[in-house]
Amino acid sequence: MKNNSQLLMPREKMLKFGISALTDVELLALFLRTGTRGKDVLTLAKEMLENFGSLYGLLTSEYEQFSGVHGIGVAKFAQLKGIAELARRYYNVRMREESPLLSPEMTREFLQSQLTGEEREIFMVIFLDSQHRVITHRRLFSGTLNHVEVHPREIIREAIKINASALILAHNHPSGCAEPSKADKLITERIIKSCQFMDLRVLDHIVIGRGEYVSFAERGWI
């Protein structure tokens, strides 16, 4: 009964004002459901966020980092990883069912859901038709902590196979800094030039960091 009453206030607040009205602490408490011995769930949620700095830091951390937080065991760690994976799959479904990319913000949110927290550089491509509706997205190349080998011909081959007319390129920087490197700019130029021969248009190249991003299109580089 004690644990149920602890959740009563966040639940009532959600039902009355909507889920977006909850603070990060209240939202986390809603997912955790229970506290630990001598610590209610709201206190536990507050301590977890203070320890990891933010929801982002919490949801992208590894189990070893949880060992220093009293009351956090395998079960609660699994709950949190489940939340992160649920969000990632939600954006996957949303991309398929809301075929057009409705806005640059939606594109960025989708890419962040796919690439945030990866320990290696991943290069992915969103393939679009002539009306800029999403056909599919693919992770085409994976690399190391700070490098990924990208082959323009493989991108073009995939685009031709699915009859794509336009592309959005994306990759992550596991270091957290989204600022593109000289190599990032050079490979983007190579891909654009290669695509021009096949009448394929590159709309953007988005680099995902830790809580930040850089859009080549927004910078005026494409």
UniProtKB/Swiss-Prot annotation:
The UniProt record lists the keyword Protease: yes
Q: Which InterPro entries match?
A: MPN (IPR037518), RadC_JAB (IPR025657), RuvA_2-like (IPR010994), UPF0758 (IPR001405), UPF0758_CS (IPR020891), UPF0758_N (IPR046778), UPF0758_YicR (IPR022820)
Q: Which domain of life is it from?
A: Bacteria
Q: Which UniProt keywords apply?
A: Hydrolase, Metal-binding, Metalloprotease, Protease, Zinc
Entry GO MF terms? metal ion binding; metallopeptidase activity
Pfam families this protein is in?
RadC, UPF0758_N
Check the record and name the CDD domains matching this protein.
Answer: MPN_DUF2466
Domain MPN residues, every copy: 100-222
Q: Which GO terms describe its biological process?
A: proteolysis
Keyword Zinc attached: yes
JAMM motif, short sequence motif: residues? 171-184
Could you say which residues bind Zn(2+) here? 171, 173, 184
Q: Which family would the database say this protein is a member of?
A: Belongs to the UPF0758 family. YicR subfamily.
This protein is called what? UPF0758 protein YicR
**Native species of this protein?**
Escherichia coli (strain K12)
